[in-house]
């Protein structure tokens, strides 16, 4: 069981993307930072907002890339490389089209599923895809031609409340995730329903 050393929240930078569906991962890390009393500070060396807290005597770093989504790997690789964090000690929180709002699931490894942020992270980590993912459901607009506008749009209040609930569920299994007990974390998280 590899303990988590880096938690990444994916999104796009700037106020025009704030609270959009595509920024669900960044929202998770913002909420986590707040819960841990951590300030996220811009660091150009890592192309993102960074923070850290201690868990059982070990540093856990937080990162929200300030690159655009399709360049997220630049930020993740810079920080992971500097601190020598292996891919299996990284958790990436991201929006998931294939799950409805209110659902959060964990996954270890796998492909990018068409998610440009995950695609770039896999590429920048040297085609290593063994990192863990926190998938936050945002739902699907129904047709692939509508996806871009959908993910870059803001969800109605009812959907946003469901996303907030799924983030609460995910924060509830933080101790298991930090300990690297993915089986227990998945059992607890996957049994939650918004």
From Swiss-Prot:
Site keyed Discriminates between blocked and unblocked aminoacyl-tRNA: positions: 12
Chief localisation class: cytoplasm
Positions of the catalytic residues: 22 (proton acceptor)
GO MF, any single term: peptidyl-tRNA hydrolase activity
Keywords: Cytoplasm, Hydrolase, RNA-binding, tRNA-binding
Main enzyme class: hydrolase
The reaction(s) this protein catalyses: an N-acyl-L-alpha-aminoacyl-tRNA + H2O = an N-acyl-L-amino acid + a tRNA + H(+)
Function: Hydrolyzes ribosome-free peptidyl-tRNAs (with 1 or more amino acids incorporated), which drop off the ribosome during protein synthesis, or as a result of ribosome stalling.
Assembly and interaction partners: Monomer.
PANTHER family: PEPTIDYL-TRNA HYDROLASE (PTHR17224:SF1)
Protein name, UniProt field: Peptidyl-tRNA hydrolase
Gene: pth
């Amino acid at each position: 069981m590899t303990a988590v050393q880096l938690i990444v929240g994916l999104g796009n930078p700037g106020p025009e993307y704030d609270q959009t569906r595509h920024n669900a991962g960044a929202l998770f890390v913002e909420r986590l930072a707040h819960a841990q009393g951590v300030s996220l500070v811009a660091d150009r060396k890592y192309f993102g907002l960074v923070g850290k807290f201690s868990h059982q005597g070990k540093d856990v770093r937080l990162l929200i890339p300030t690159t655009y989504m399709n360049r997220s790997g630049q930020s993740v690789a810079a920080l992971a490389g500097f601190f020598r964090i292996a891919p299996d000690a990284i958790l990436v929180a991201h929006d998931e089209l294939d799950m409805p709002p209110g659902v959060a699931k964990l996954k270890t490894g796998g492909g990018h599923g068409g998610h440009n942020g995950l695609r770039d992270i896999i590429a920048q980590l040297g085609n290593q895809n063994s990192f863990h993912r926190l998938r936050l459901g945002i739902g699907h607009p129904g047709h692939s031609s509508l996806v871009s506008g959908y993910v870059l749009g803001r969800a109605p209040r009812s959907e946003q409340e469901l996303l907030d609930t799924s983030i609460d569920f995910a924060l509830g299994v933080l101790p298991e995730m930090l300990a690297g007990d993915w089986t227990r974390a998945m059992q607890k998280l996957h049994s939650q329903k918004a």
